[in-house]
Every structure is written in C-alpha cells, then in structure tokens.
Amino acid sequence: MTDLREKKRTAFFRGHSAERFASVLLLLKGFRIVARRYRTRLGEIDLIARRGNLILIVEVKARSSLEAAHLAVTPQAMRRIEAAADLWLQRQPDHARLSLRFDLIAVLPRRWPKHVPAFFTSGNY
C-alpha cells in the first residue's frame, strides 16, 4: 500500500472515530442524532442533532489544537455545509418550526471534545 493511500485511510478512520466521540458528547447534552455524514450534491454534513426545535448542523474536526480545528473550516466549506443544511431542512415536514445552528466540535488529543456553539452563522463566513 502506498504512503498516500495509507494516510487517506488513517484520516478516514480518524474522522469516523472523531464523529463517534462527538456524537457521544451531543447525546450527553440531551440531543438526538438525526443523521451522520449526510451527503447531498451540494455538500456533506458530519452530524445533524436535534433537541426540541433546535437543529445542530455540526462540523467535526480532529486536530491537535482548537485553533487548528477553527482554521480547518474554510469559508468554502461553510458555504457547502450551509447549502447541504438548506436541502436537509427543506425535506423536513416541520421545517417552519425549526431553528438551525452551525456548530463545531473539535476532537483534541487526550481531551474531551470542545463544543463551539454557533461557530458560524448563515451567510457570514
């Protein structure tokens, strides 16, 4: 196996592990996980969680520091996440009652994940 293929494979499994860890954090906070790795033609959402009428659109980043996790979410990624969230929301029968929030969960080495509520807002990148 080539080095590049091995790096991609490692990153893939690290990402899955980080998303599972982030899911546990959200469950402990009283959220229900509605979708994992929600894919559309416009983009992908790592996690969608719900508590009441609040919907969290969550980007999960496994990085060495909180700053590195912040920097890993580019304005282009934010636009794709928002576009995917809009498509998901349109498909919900109770979409008029729902409030969306775009959060970041940074999974850091040997620490509990850091939840950053309202990491970005719609249209503000």
Curated annotation (Swiss-Prot):
Domain of life the protein comes from: Bacteria
Pfam family, one: UPF0102
One GO MF term: nucleic acid binding
Stated family: Belongs to the UPF0102 family.
Protein name: UPF0102 protein Oant_0187
Lineage, top ranks: Bacteria, Pseudomonadati, Pseudomonadota, Alphaproteobacteria, Hyphomicrobiales
